[in-house]
Swiss-Prot record:
Keywords: Capsid protein, Host cytoplasm, Late protein, Viral capsid assembly, Viral contractile tail ejection system, Viral genome ejection through host cell envelope, Viral genome packaging, Viral penetration into host cytoplasm, Viral release from host cell, Virion, Virus entry into host cell. It comes from Escherichia phage Mu. One of its GO terms (cellular component) is viral capsid. The gene is H. Homododecamer. Part of the immature prohead complex. Might interact with viral I protease; this interaction gives rise to an early 25S initiator complex. The scaffolding protein Z and the capsid protein T should then be added to this initiator complex to yield the immature prohead. Host GroEL and GroES are also essential for the correct assembly of viral head and tail. It is found in: Virion; Host cytoplasm. Cleavage by the viral I protease yields a C-terminally cleaved portal protein competent for DNA packaging and procpasid maturation. Induction: Expressed in the late phase of the viral replicative cycle. Expression of late genes is activated by the viral late transcription activator C. InterPro entries: Portal_Mu (IPR009279). One of its GO terms (biological process) is symbiont genome ejection through host cell envelope, contractile tail mechanism. It comes from the Viruses. The keyword Cytoplasm does not apply. This is Portal protein. Forms the portal vertex of the capsid. This portal plays critical roles in head assembly, genome packaging, neck/tail attachment, and genome ejection. The portal protein multimerizes as a single ring-shaped homododecamer arranged around a central channel. Binds to the terminase subunits to form the packaging machine. Acts as a linker between the capsid and tail. Required for attachment of the neck proteins to the capsid.
Length: 512
């Protein structure tokens, strides 16, 4: 394929061979994890973070891998953020006021990505950037009919990459060179999740979470040692003056063995005493572990009450924290959408579109982050609101996440209740018996009469509500009463009573 333009407008020669399969990277791609978290100290952690600031991302990436693997609480909280993205519906939308060709391109991309088996896994793997700051997936290109498309995305170890020393925001593959190997255009799906402002090596949550991770592990280790001796009697061996080192070692072995096997032997002349059982409290250890886990939850999800039970008011505070978590999720999908548009949508369009591509009018992925409305509350409010305003049905369906029926699709309906007329008495009067029926009906109350009568009555109240608000209108209710015009209402009620009386008399006469 000839030269094409990347998303920044620079021409390049497209190569569909995977960059990681080149001979110069063969040894680099075979690396294994170093597991720097084993025995990590605050000083060692600080050194790894400083290395990442200078562009060496290897140790920090390996450290993040270990943290997620070893800490179940950290893993659980990260999983909530990653899986929240996968739970969202999405679509490829064209630019605003799209032309026919732009709509065609968007439909083509939407259909392909929804059918792509690798896309959901790619979304999940992109979530790895939340902790590590970046996620790198190599694109394997192939053919689908006449379309040049990705057939697979391969997640690559973040430790394989470094930052360009001359531009710490540019990721490159690590090789034997000082600057690293530049990434192949259209060859990588790179997602950067910025949890903080800074260079690529400082974006990840790992830099914040490493400290509660270390302090929690210290407390867990100390707590385990406390449990080993808690409740056990103190064992003291006594040896006579002049005992040899061998005799002392024999006594020490007996002291240690008797704690595990409840038996042992010692030389004559030596004694073994049992003191009071070791006591103490586990509260300090558990308090430290609890603090560390809450700090981890705050850093990842913005709060703690979406994770565990709280004290009084936990329900309302939990709802607030859940709203914060939704805001974090929306920010995550906003960053992810930009990465997808840059590294997947644009290359697909550049390689397969029949028209000239305008960088400013590209289709893009749109995640549906809207929440379904409370159907009970809306069902009660909509009829009342509809009395004073025009409400589009499409808006109600969007709020409730109820789709519009397509074609002759079956729809749910309420079956009308058929009254049982068997036990009802047949009407005693007929049109022939009462030729004046139409005249009596005209004397009754029509909907229009009711509206004309009520409008003057309520006009002062409505005006006060619109001008000052409902609360002010309630306070002024007593003063508004004299302004209400009830003349029409009195006349309407008089007519209604008269008609009801006439119908009652005629019905009674017919029964006789």
């Amino acid at each position: 394929m000839g030269r094409i333009l990347d998303i920044s407008g620079q021409p390049f020669d497209f190569d569909d061979e995977m960059q990681s399969r080149s001979d110069e990277l063969a040894m680099v791609m075979k690396r294994t994890q170093e597991h720097p978290s084993s025995g990590v100290t605050p000083n060692r952690a600080a050194q790894m973070l400083r290395d990442a600031e200078r562009g060496d991302l290897t140790a920090q990436a390996d450290l993040a891998f270990d943290m997620e693997e070893k800490d179940t609480h950290l893993f659980s909280e990260l999983s909530k953020r990653r899986l929240a993205i996968q739970a969202l519906e999405w679509r490829i939308a064209p630019a605003r006021d799209a032309s026919a060709q732009e709509k065609k391109d968007a439909d083509m991309l939407n259909e392909y990505l929804h059918d792509a088996a690798w896309f959901e896994d790619a979304l999940f793997d992109a979530g790895d950037a939340i902790l590590k700051g970046y996620s790198m997936q190599e694109i394997e290109w192939g053919w689908l009919g006449k379309m040049r498309v990705p057939v697979a995305l391969h997640h690559r170890d973040p430790a394989l990459f470094c930052a360009n020393p001359d531009n710490l925001n540019e990721l490159r593959l690590r090789d034997a060179s000082y600057h690293g190997l530049e990434l192949q255009p259209f060859g990588w799906f790179m997602h950067r999740a910025k949890s903080r402002t800074g260079y690529v090596g400082t974006n990840g949550l790992v830099r914040t979470l490493i400290w509660p991770f270390i302090f929690k592990n210290y407390s867990v280790r100390d707590f385990a040692e406390f449990l080993e001796i808690y409740g056990l009697p103190m064992r003291v061996g006594k040896y006579p003056t002049g005992s040899t080192n061998r005799e002392k070692a024999t006594l020490m072995q007996a002291v240690m063995d008797i704690g595990r096997r409840a038996g042992g032997i010692i030389p004559m002349g030596m004694t073994l005493d049992f003191q009071s059982a070791a006591d103490g409290q586990s509260d300090p250890f558990m308090a430290m572990i609890g603090w560390a886990e809450k700090a981890i939850s705050k850093a990842i999800l913005g709060g703690t009450l979406t994770t565990e039970a709280g004290d009084k008011g936990a329900r309302s505070l939990g709802e607030v924290h859940d709203e914060v978590r939704r805001e974090i999720r929306n920010a995550d999908v906003g960053q992810l959408a930009r990465s997808i548009n840059r590294d997947l949508i644009y290359p697909l369009l550049a390689l397969n579109s029949d028209s000239t591509i305008d960088i400013n009018r590209l289709p893009g992925i749109v995640f549906d982050t809207s929440e379904a409305g409370d159907i009970t509350a809306l069902s009660d409010a909509i009829p009342k609101l509809a009395a004073g305003m025009r409400i589009p049905v499409s808006w109600i369906q969007e709020k409730l996440h109820i789709p519009q029926p397509v074609g002759d699709e079956a729809v749910f309906t309420i079956q009308p209740v058929v009254p049982d007329n068997g036990s009802q008495k047949e009407a005693a009067l007929s049109a022939e018996d009462i030729p004046q029926e139409d005249d009596i009906d005209r004397m009754g109350v029509s909907p229009e009469d009711w509206q004309r009568s009520v409008d003057p009555l309520l006009k002062p109240v409505i005006f006060s509500v619109l001008k000052d608000g409902p609360e002010a209108a309630m306070n002024k209710a007593a003063s508004l009463y004299p302004q209400m015009d009830d003349a029409e209402l009195i006349d309407m009620l008089t007519r209604a009573i008269f008609v009801a009386d006439i119908w009652g008399r005629l019905d009674a006469a017919a029964d006789h």
